[in-house]
Amino acid sequence: MDQKEVIGETGHKSVDLIKIMDKWQKKWTEAKIFEAEHDSRDKFFITAAFPYLNGVLHAGHLRTFTIPETIARYQRMKNKNVLWTFGFHVTGTPILGLANQIKERKEDIIWAYNNLHNIPMDELLKLNTPEAIVECFSKKATEAFKRMGFSLDWRRNFKTDDKVFSKFIEWQFYKLKEMGHITKGSHPVRYCPKCENPVEDHDLLHGEESTTVEYSLIKFTSKFDGKEIIMPMATLRPETVFGVTNAWVNPNEIYVMAEVHDEIQKLDSEDVDLKYNGIWIIGKECADKLKEQDRKIEILKEIKGSELLGLKIKNPVTKKEVPLLPADFVEMGIGTGCVMSVPAHAPYDYVALRDLGKVEEVGLIPLIEIEGYDKYPAKEIVEKLGIKDQNDEELLEQATSKIYKDEFHKGKLNENCGEYTGISVKDIKEKLTKDYINSNIAEIMYEFSEQKVVCRCGEKCIIKTVKGQWFINYSDENWKKLAHECIDNMNFAPEGIRQEFHNKVDWMKDKACARKRGLGTILPFDENWIIESLSDSTIYMAYYTIARFINEGLTPEQLIPELFDYVYLGNGNAEEIAKNSKIQAETIEEMRKEFLYYYPLDWRCSAKDLIPNHLTFMIFNHVALFGREHWPRGIEINGYVTIEGKKLSKSKGPVLPVSEVAENFGADVARFYITTCAELPQDADVKFKEMEKARDNLIKLYDLAVSVMEEESAEKELSLIDKWLLHKTYSSINSAETAYEEFQLRKIGLMFYELINDLRWYKRRGGENNSVLKEVVEIWTKLLSPVTPHLCEEIWEKLGYAGFISQEMYPVSKPELINEDLELGEEFIKSAMEDIRNIKGVAKINPEKMYLYTADDWKYDLLEFMNENAEKNVKALIPMVMKEDKFKRHGKEVMKLINEIMKIGVKKAIAEVEILENAKTFIESEFDCKVIVNGEDVKGKKKFAIPYKPAIYME
């Protein structure tokens, strides 16, 4: 096979990637080379958030899991003792719900799992119990991991419904309760009425990222139908009550008059007392919601919205009466169906009043002073943007967003706000809400941040105040301080997400940690409850460290709390625990050593959807249960995955099962593409044409390896182009190391594609040193092996090496072969040739003779001067340059040259004449003409030459 053909435009399709994949996976399994135990080497412990087994592993899993897999392989090459393993998440209600849906033969579910998850119909219809689903998808997940060539220690694998794992979770919850972190009480939670359970993100079909939003209900009052009534107005900005000029109701909707009682929970009991809270007029949907939020609602009558128009209601803060006016934009699914109007500051309100011709009648009341705005910000921005009416929704959204942002960051309450005058908008909400509640002019109502929040069972979720519920008190300020301390000392990839974790900790509230149904561990101190799935998955990384011992045959009964106290906290005596647990003391000591060796966790890897829940909970639980020396050290976050621009969906598609990708493209192609197609925080869009290109380029490396082994590798004196290729290759060792260390895996892909281009250039420049090519292939096979291990194992074997490349050390760079001048020289030649092509194209000539002129010496001196002062901008640089006599005499030409050099980039000066002379034969062959370097100055062209840009004349 001719190497020149191999590194040309197309690679051979002579290699069977699937066959290679099968071969090396079998060899790895037989050799057990990825099983890890404590020894004298430095350790490296990396994990990813384990998958939930209600479907096959898909492209999103592939990206999230291949990143730590790649880093694990790299760290082994750095002689680290790497622990990299996986468990499976099965607890909670989704699997239970799926089993019921299959049992009921739900058409959409049957279609999805048959067509998207590729489950044969006869097998699918048997998945009508949680146990069958767990067995099916745990096997498929295991097979998918193995088909992708993941270098896992399978001895540590577990499922979260394992009885032995439940003993670990029981220990965790006993500890949290002892510390006062678990309490019982009433709290608003996301709730499924059909399942009769609080629901978490994993339980949802829609609205996984929804949060619970706290609205203030401002209690306006009036008389209606002969009764004193309250008309509560829901708002996220209670300070705006000072600027209310009217209120909006929807004339086309149904409202209710209802008698409201507050439910007051009795001490140490789930029973309640009722406290009368007046007669309210609210939307019908609002009444249904408030029934679930510590209120008893008795409907007295229904009222059409149109019947309320013109009613005067009293502002409880300003004591002014304002009218109810009609507005079709009032959404009954949010708040109470009655909305405060603040037209001085809300563009929607101002435009709606203007459309009704009511602006002058009700007036405008300013309440916030904002730098850069006049007295009435909404009026000003509406007129500035030319908003015609309420149909200009896009402009209204733009106006509203800008004003609210500016008010929050720069606004202060004005003299219309009484005792609150001068307080900034960003600081007022909490104080004002507290004052209003204490004065009985406001209450709290909870809504979702998204309107569509649906349980996996298909039921629409609500916010319910659950009584007698167990909570983890993540709102504890002292606990939050420890979490912040942990975050401050962690590594993050990308670094920019650190602040997001701080924000999540600040916003964290108490969280329901148990439910009445589903799979999982029974709450050890209240057997009526089951620990929910985001609470039993916060410290299981510690379980990995001892799972191999447990999986050798320990029983749940042997895993007594004292065992975990000793292993994880160092409390107690191994001999005493051995007597009580019937576990050998030596095994207990080994478990303790293994934990101390591998902990803390070096890196936790996940997609960004787990930041507000699992990952933040992980930090909280670690700082509560473990000493600082065992707090997690790093978190890596990647973006989502789409398929040809379409969002992944387990129920609607696309899914792209991992096993399908492995069989169609080969594991290495999938691994290479998914880790290198996007920067870490960006979403990755899988495009099959690009995967095919990746496959072709990987095959080129294989074919090159075969070709260099077929040809003689006689020692030759190194040419300049040989030295250039070696420089590029040995420079790549350092660059790749940095990329791996910083999780910048896209750079590995870009470097590989650059290698392919470099090999083409090497061939084009006459490179033919087989020894050099073999050296390049050996190094790059190592550099790529963490990403494409099967192909690299095969190449390593073809190169004549015994053993696994998976156990080789990372290549060592050779500083003596790194010479930046070589790289700058070749880039200079490429640039000059591009300029020649452009001139030929514009002039439309085929020259017989071509003159290349390099710059005058003073121009190189200027380049060096700029290089020495590279931190200076042009404005600062010019006075410094003009102080030098050798530059000053060239006057305006200097100014122009500085700008031109800045455009091409300030680089060190190189021997351009020598470089062009050495490349002259090559350039002549490329353009089929005679090349003269710095010959006679034909038509005065030489003066146009600048460093890195030779002047060109053709004839």
From Swiss-Prot:
Q: What's a GO biological-process term for it?
A: leucyl-tRNA aminoacylation
Which sites bind ATP?
A: K650
Could you list this entry's UniProt keywords, alphabetically sorted.
Aminoacyl-tRNA synthetase, ATP-binding, Cytoplasm, Ligase, Nucleotide-binding, Protein biosynthesis
Report the catalytic activity. tRNA(Leu) + L-leucine + ATP = L-leucyl-tRNA(Leu) + AMP + diphosphate
Show the GO cellular component annotation of the record: cytoplasm
For this UniProt entry, the molecular function terms from Gene Ontology, in alphabetical order, are:
aminoacyl-tRNA deacylase activity; ATP binding; leucine-tRNA ligase activity
**Principal location listed in the UniProt entry:** cytoplasm
Where does motif 'HIGH' region map?
51-61
Keyword Protein biosynthesis on this protein?
yes
A Pfam family matched in the record: tRNA-synt_1
Asked if Ligase is a keyword of the record, the answer is yes
Q: What is its EC number?
A: 6.1.1.4
PROSITE patterns in the record, alphabetically?
AA_TRNA_LIGASE_I (PS00178)
**Location in or out of the cell:** Cytoplasm
Residues forming the motif 'KMSKS' region are 647-651
- NCBIfam families in the record: leuS_arch, PRK12300.1
Q: Which family does it belong to?
A: Belongs to the class-I aminoacyl-tRNA synthetase family.
- This chain belongs to the protein called Leucine--tRNA ligase
Native organism: Methanococcus maripaludis (strain DSM 14266 / JCM 13030 / NBRC 101832 / S2 / LL)
Q: Which gene encodes it?
A: leuS
